[in-house]
A protein has these predicted regions:
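Glycine-rich, highly charged phosphate/nucleotide-binding loops
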Residues: 47-74, 183-192
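Glycine/small-residue-rich loop that forms an oxyanion/phosphate-binding "nest" at active or ligand-binding sites
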Residues: 66-130
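A C-terminal functional module that forms or caps the active site or interfaces directly
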Residues: 177-225, 230-234
Length: 256
């Protein structure tokens, strides 16, 4: 059986190792292709690795090159099943994969990482999109923004009364005096996050509900420092796919 695993997360790495371990148990052999955008870091997995997305395989003038390229890739590599373990906010790749699998009549299995849940010790301000997040940020002066890539136009439009601390990959900006960029890859321990929040005089944390079984360092740090958190809610498509699993063991059993 040939499986295409859409990755780029720690969950995907764990799933890949679990699938490869099945080959040593004497069951059905799995030929795994691990796909990653390749923006941040390359995984160390003993299987074929595809990097750079799928639009490179698109031909002609397709309206959706990524989707057409993925279809070409799946057909060319004789993929039997597609497993999506991308980030919960990676809507485009998940939608493309689900659509392609439906058209090719092959199984599509989606891993949905459990979201973080607010506690009575947290002060979350829930928002549905980036526009709402920016509006919620307005009363604060020193937000810590950890939502991923920030558009150049947003960096150039930081309100005069604010100084942003960013931990993300951003485009170049002509304005350099209203933000500081921290280039680092997690996970981050609570002690690290407390030190960062205090050093940069942060008064609000802005993040996505990426979720996971582990307690997030920045959320526990914000809780201890009594800081509010502007939480960008999960996309509505989070559980819109037919075969979705929030437990890795159930997912592995379904793939087998």
């Amino acid at each position: 059986m040939k499986v295409l695993l859409l990755g780029g997360t720690r969950d995907a790495i764990n799933i890949a190792h679990s699938l490869l371990a099945l080959n040593e148990s004497g069951g059905q052999r799995i030929a795994l292709i691990y796909s990653i955008a390749g923006i941040v870091r390359q995984p160390t997995i003993n299987c074929a690795i595809h990097t750079g997305g799928f639009s490179q395989f698109s031909t002609g003038t397709a309206s959706n090159p990524s989707q057409q390229g993925m279809k070409q890739f799946i057909q060319h590599n004789n993929i039997d099943k597609v497993v999506d373990a991308t980030h919960p906010y990676a809507i485009t790749i998940s939608t493309n994969a689900s659509t392609v699998c439906e058209r090719l009549d092959i199984p599509f299995l989606k891993y949905v990482r459990p979201p973080w849940l607010v506690t009575d010790k947290d002060h979350w301000i829930n928002v549905n999109n980036w526009a709402e997040a920016k509006k919620a940020m307005h009363p604060f002066k020193r937000p810590f923004v950890t939502i991923g890539r920030i558009a150049n136009q947003d960096i150039n439009a930081i309100p005069e009364h604010q100084f942003w601390t960013l931990r993300s990959a951003i485009e170049e900006s002509q304005i350099q005096d209203q933000y500081s960029l921290i280039k680092a890859v997690g996970p981050f321990a609570e002690e690290q996050e407390i030190k960062l929040l205090q050093t940069h005089h942060i008064d609000v944390v802005v993040c996505k509900n990426s979720g996971g079984s582990a307690v997030d360092g920045k959320l526990s740090a914000a809780r201890k420092l009594n800081l509010p958190v502007i939480m960008l809610n999960r996309p509505e498509t989070d559980r819109a796919y037919g075969n979705h699993y929030d437990n890795e063991h159930d997912l592995i059993r379904a793939i087998r």
